Amino acid sequence: MLAVTLLSLALLGSTCACSTSTSYEAGIVCRITKAALLVLNQETAKVIQTAFQRASYPDIKGERSMMLLGRVTYGLHNIQISHLSIASSQVELVEAKSVDVSIQNASVIFKGTLNYGYKGAWGLNIEQSVDFEIESAIDLQINTKLTCDSGHVRTDAPDCSISFHKLLLHLQGEREPGWTKQLFTNIISFTLKMVLKGQVCKEINVISNIMADFVQTRAANIISDRDIEVDISLTRSPIITATYLESHHKGHFIYKNISEVLPLPAFSPTLLGDTRMLYFWFSEQVLDSLAKAAFQDGRLQLNLAETELKVVLETWHFNPNQEIIPEVITGFPSPGQVTVHCPRRPTISCQNKGVVVSSPVVMEFLFPHKDGQDSVTHTFEEDIVATIQASYSKKKLFLSLVDFQIKPKTTSNMAESSESIQNFLQLMITTVGIPEIMSRLEVALTTLMNSKGLDLFDIINPEIITRDGFLLLQMDFGFPEHLLVDFLQSLN
């Protein structure tokens, strides 16, 4: 159950404002469907086993008057789990209510020490201490609600029940029934059932909230990088339907702890389906804010030394007219470097044909001066509008250029400028600059995503789709074993 609900939260995870609004306003929306829950349910046994093992089982003590034996006292001590196996489990989504998980035919073996004694009618005092095993077969029903507490997502399982089909007491490893075994089985069975139910259900709630914090921290880390963070607070409580779980997030970017709060766009549930396991909806406002944060952080700049520039030109098979290049660098013995940067922040919008990036671009040719300082010999600025489509395959991000427009704006050192130089620079940006920037972005973004552990997920047939005003990710996935392993290790 925890593997279902809480690993779902690893995908949905966030802090929340606990709003009771019925509106659908968000910058980011996440939908995880019933098919995904069935995959996550595969490893329910490991988390349930952890709950049983972590539960603290109190000593069970009591006494009872028995015919012939007199007053019998008993105590079960050091109760622990020695084995647990689950035959099957099912998960259901109850609309507007809960995530329900049924576990059938779980085999659980408890072990510990039994102390007992009695004073018989003939003055006999008998005290014994023996090791025991309790062999049980149970069904477990857990109905989990997603709630908010102190600004965080919390899970609550008020409906947690355990049904015992078998409860056998074995003393010192013996399997043949005896009067002692029969006596204490009858005495302690009811008490033991109540204690186990209370402790196991309590531990399930404890672990669920530990895991909620774990996955929310992990989710926040995945979408943060240095001074750039994303506010993924919920704009309303999570939605549960018969076919999916859905959460709605602000998606405001935070740069150096300063957040720009913008009006949230409207989201329509009909924009997402339920045939894939996982959906993410991003408004173009989120992508535009990302471009702004990257610009503020100085990430939109490229510096190439002379040797690097030559390698880049060769990579893209650029063979410019040899008479033009000397004209650009007239008066300087050897070029220092070329710098490409955005003087103002880019803007991003989403259209059916792709993500549209509009940005002013400045190219500066820098050459060493006689006094050892760099000197700008030529500056070329233009406005570029590029339409890009993206795909993700074999754990790598790929960008493809669908369309572009270039509008020259200004050049410096006009005495050295000419129409041929402008044509050369425009040609170089078209055939080298844009492809090189996109290639470097592919590598940088893939490296960033993998540094956050994205490559550890088994992502199946992902699709990146753009529509007017938003970008949509939809995919299937295999069970995120690494998340479960990390979480279970964190409990130790």
Curated annotation (Swiss-Prot):
Cysteines engaged in disulfide bonds, as pairs = 160-201
**Compartments, as annotated in UniProt:** Secreted
Q: Which domain of life is it from?
A: Eukaryota
Looking up CDD domains in the UniProt record yields: BPI1
Reactions that this protein is recorded to catalyse: cholesteryl (9Z-octadecenoate)(in) = cholesteryl (9Z-octadecenoate)(out); 1,2,3-tri-(9Z-octadecenoyl)-glycerol(in) = 1,2,3-tri-(9Z-octadecenoyl)-glycerol(out); cholesteryl (9Z,12Z)-octadecadienoate(in) = cholesteryl (9Z,12Z)-octadecadienoate(out)
* GO biological-process terms attached to the record: cholesterol homeostasis; cholesterol metabolic process; cholesterol transport; high-density lipoprotein particle remodeling; low-density lipoprotein particle remodeling; phosphatidylcholine metabolic process; phospholipid homeostasis; reverse cholesterol transport
Alphabetized UniProt keyword annotations: Cholesterol metabolism, Disulfide bond, Glycoprotein, Lipid metabolism, Lipid transport, Secreted, Signal, Steroid metabolism, Sterol metabolism, Transport
**Sugar-modified residues:** 257
Q: Name the gene that codes for it.
A: CETP
Signal peptide coordinates: 1-17
Give the molecular function GO annotations: cholesterol binding; cholesterol transfer activity; phosphatidylcholine binding; phospholipid transporter activity; triglyceride binding
What name goes with this protein?
A: Cholesteryl ester transfer protein
Please spell out the taxonomic lineage of the organism that makes this protein: Eukaryota, Metazoa, Chordata, Craniata, Vertebrata
Write out the GO cellular component annotations: extracellular space; high-density lipoprotein particle
Role played: Involved in the transfer of neutral lipids, including cholesteryl ester and triglyceride, among lipoprotein particles. Allows the net movement of cholesteryl ester from high density lipoproteins/HDL to triglyceride-rich very low density lipoproteins/VLDL, and the equimolar transport of triglyceride from VLDL to HDL. Regulates the reverse cholesterol transport, by which excess cholesterol is removed from peripheral tissues and returned to the liver for elimination.
